Design a protein with these regions (language model features):
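Metal-dependent active-site segment of extracytoplasmic phospho-/sulfohydrolases and closely related
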Residues: 38-82, 156, 201
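Active-site neighborhoods of enzymes that stabilize oxyanions during catalysis
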Residues: 97-220
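Acidic/histidine-rich catalytic neighborhood
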Residues: 58, 65-114
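Short catalytic/ligand-binding loop motif for oxyanion handling, primarily in non-cytosolic enzymes
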Residues: 19-23, 70-73, 78-79, 165-167
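Short secondary-structure boundary/capping segments
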Residues: 26-30, 76-81, 171-174
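Short, well-ordered beta-to-alpha junction loops that form the rim of enzyme active sites
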Residues: 13-17, 65, 159-162
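A long, amphipathic alpha-helix that forms part
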Residues: 2-11, 18-61, 121-128
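Histidine-centered active-site/metal-ligand motif
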Residues: 14, 20-24, 67, 182-183, ...
Length: 220
């Protein structure tokens, strides 16, 4: 209706059904197939709306994904290790203060450091328990910046295949995946874009050159 009535110059639409479905059901299954068919129908409805509005021939369409997904078998909670080594202070089950804290981004996590005097000690601890924490990569702030990630953190860790990181600071370091939070669900994201299936980028319209295949892109 918006397209037909207002004929906007620019319209940005986020179809989140596939993302939600993969978080809850995994990468490839009947539910994912249903979500893909729903997305296909909605895209068809949008294209048809431009035809009904008489703007189809003047409209450029860009269809893209913002990330892929990887499966999650277990959730790893590095804050349990940090707490046991005095980096996190807890009272009555709540964090009262911390020298360092791991904040989950799914398959990666950002490490916020309040006490820079312990930064070297923290790095050594993570290196020592790298295998137990299922860490594949430890990036410094500068290395993360070179990859296009900025933020109020000192390090970023990325997990091995099949795990995501959690925020829990008590209990077991290793827990089962949990669909109550998308970061810890049976499939999630937060990994380097070189892993897994890469999101699509499809463009067509009067200002788009046809028949061109772009192997990869970089937004930096």
């Amino acid at each position: 209706d918006i397209i037909k009535e207002y004929k906007p110059d620019l319209m940005l639409i986020h179809l989140a059904t596939l993302d939600h479905t993969r978080h809850n059901y995994g990468l490839f299954n009947d539910e994912v197939d249903k979500a893909l068919k729903m997305n296909d129908k909605w895209l068809g409805d949008i294209i048809q709306a431009t035809k009904d509005a008489g703007t189809y021939k003047d409209t450029n369409f860009i269809i893209l994904g913002d990330h892929g997904h990887l499966r999650v078998d277990k959730v790893i909670n590095p804050n349990v290790l940090l707490k046991s080594n005095g980096f996190i202070k807890v009272e009555n089950g709540e964090v009262k203060d911390f020298d360092a804290y791991v904040n989950s981004s799914g398959i990666s996590a950002q490490i916020i450091v309040n006490n820079l005097d312990r930064l070297t000690e923290l790095r050594e601890l993570l290196e020592e328990f790298k295998e137990e924490l299922f860490i594949e990569n430890i990036f410094t702030k500068e290395e993360a910046s070179n990859l296009g990630l900025e933020g109020d953190f000192e390090m970023v860790i990325e997990g091995l295949e099949g795990i995501s990181f959690g925020n829990d600071f008590e209990g077991s370091i290793i827990k089962d995946s949990d669909i109550k939070d998308y970061k810890f669900a049976v499939a999630t994201h937060g990994h380097l874009p070189t892993k897994g299936n890469r999101p699509p980028f499809i463009a067509f319209g009067p200002n788009i050159k046809g028949g061109v295949v772009i192997e990869e892109g970089d937004l930096r």
